[in-house]
Curated annotation (Swiss-Prot):
This is Putative antitoxin VapB5. Keywords: Cell membrane, Membrane, Toxin-antitoxin system, Transmembrane, Transmembrane helix. Possibly the antitoxin component of a type II toxin-antitoxin (TA) system. Its cognate toxin is VapC5 (Potential). GO terms for cellular component: plasma membrane. The lineage of its organism: Archaea, Methanobacteriati, Methanobacteriota, Methanomada group, Methanococci. It is a multi-pass membrane protein. The chain crosses the membrane at residues 3-23, 65-85. It is found in: Cell membrane. Its main location: membrane.
Amino acid sequence: MQGPVIIPLISTLGLSFLAILLAYKISFSVIGFINSTLPTTLFPSKPYMLFVKISTISPLTCPSLIILTPALTWSLTALSMAYLYSSYKPNTFFTLSKNVSSFLTTG
């Protein structure tokens, strides 16, 4: 890879990692709040269903949240970093994408 590609790539990966951690923290907080406010039983009239929780979805148990949350945050962060870098230096976004595509096709 050439020099102009390395610097935004490293900063994008670092910010993406922080965005993933923040997304998991937010999702755990929101799901914890929902679990604490919802009723704890599906069927209160049936005693044997007393300990069944209504909301059992969390990023650890729901595969779609495990996959989508980091993927969305990473892609949004990568796009915003590329846009900011290209606005800082004109025509950089085109050069960056051209360098990455030529690296992927030749290497």
